């Protein structure tokens, strides 16, 4: 089964295409624009490549197994969103809000997570190669089994994060990091 098209997905009586057009007008400051609020929407198995949802309200939205490659989501509120097995490669989530989101088994390599709230996010078994987690809040986040090769964790407080089973040999860690801040296999 292929990915669903935007015109075939409805939320609140409107198609996703209509919601996105209105959001683009809002984002540009044009008349008639409305910030996208897709709280609780089912947008799973959808083709959302290069979509611009900057600043959108996406709380508890189901994006499972959707294609979000190169999506623009800076400042978006993805609290509690379901992104398991989604493809988020090279998406921009700068300053996005994701507490409690599920990104388990997501393909999330190359993501910009700069200054994100990633508290209590489930990253278990996710592919997080070349991600930037500088200044992100990762308290309570579960990274166990994730592939974090060449990830940037500089200036990130890892207190309370679960990094068990993660190979950190090529990961750029915070200066002076000793491993006691986070749960690490063998630490």
In which residue ranges do the predicted regions lie?
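Long, contiguous interaction/recruitment modules in multidomain scaffold/adaptor proteins
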Residues: 1-2
């Amino acid at each position: 089964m292929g990915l669903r098209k935007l015109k075939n997905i409805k939320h609140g009586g409107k198609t996703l295409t209509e919601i996105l057009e209105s959001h683009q007008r809002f984002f540009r400051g044009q008349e008639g624009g409305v910030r996208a609020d897709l709280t609780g929407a089912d947008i799973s198995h959808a083709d959302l490549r290069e979509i611009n949802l900057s600043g959108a309200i996406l709380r508890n939205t189901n994006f499972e197994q959707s294609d979000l490659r190169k999506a623009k989501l800076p400042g978006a509120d993805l609290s509690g969103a379901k992104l398991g097995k989604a493809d988020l490669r090279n998406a921009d989530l700068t300053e996005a809000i994701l507490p409690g989101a599920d990104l388990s088994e997501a393909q999330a390599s190359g993501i910009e997570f700069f200054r994100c709230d990633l508290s209590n996010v489930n990253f278990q078994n996710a592919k997080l190669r070349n991600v930037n987690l500088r200044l992100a809040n990762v308290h309570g986040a579960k990274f166990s089994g994730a592939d974090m090769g060449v990830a940037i964790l500089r200036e990130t407080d890892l207190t309370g994060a679960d990094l068990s089973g993660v190979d950190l040999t090529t990961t750029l860690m915070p200066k002076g990091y000793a491993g006691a801040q986070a749960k690490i296999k063998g630490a």
